[in-house]
């Protein structure tokens, strides 16, 4: 199956993760709920390693491909924090925390990276390591 079809199969989950993260914004290094959600998902996807608590709330996942071990590694990253802004839009997934909002896209970036991690962990049709 082409990769785009595989990713499309997970679109509803990716959207739900984004909406959940958007509704529960956290600032700077105090992204404990978001970090726990990310770590839980990465572990459920079957990553080779999931390390938490980096720089207080950072999360790192490691996925090793099934190809010949070339020793190559690529890093994918996303910020998880929100901004100290009051959300005034009336959406079903509107911020539930006064004075905090995902106004810069980190909720979407985190959800998309979770989708990529899920796809890579399920397929592993690459050579090297993704961190």
Per-segment meaning from a language model:
Residues 1-102, 111-114, 118-127:
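Acidic/His- and Gly-rich active-site-bordering loop/insert found
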Residues 129-131:
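Divalent metal-dependent hydrolysis catalytic cores, especially in the metallo-beta-lactamase
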């Amino acid at each position: 199956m082409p990769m785009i079809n595989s990713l499309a199969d997970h679109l509803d989950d990716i959207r739900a993760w984004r909406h959940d993260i958007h509704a529960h914004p956290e600032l700077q290094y105090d992204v404990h709920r978001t970090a726990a959600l990310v770590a839980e998902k990465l572990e459920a996807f079957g990553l080779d390693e999931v390390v938490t608590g980096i720089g207080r709330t950072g999360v790192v996942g490691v996925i090793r491909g099934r190809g010949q071990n070339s020793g190559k590694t690529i890093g994918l990253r996303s910020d998880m924090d929100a901004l100290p802004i009051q959300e005034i839009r009336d959406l079903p997934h509107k911020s539930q925390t006064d004075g905090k909002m995902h106004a810069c896209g980190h909720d979407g970036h985190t959800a998309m990276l979770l989708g990529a991690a899920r796809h890579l962990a399920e397929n592993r049709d690459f050579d090297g390591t993704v961190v």
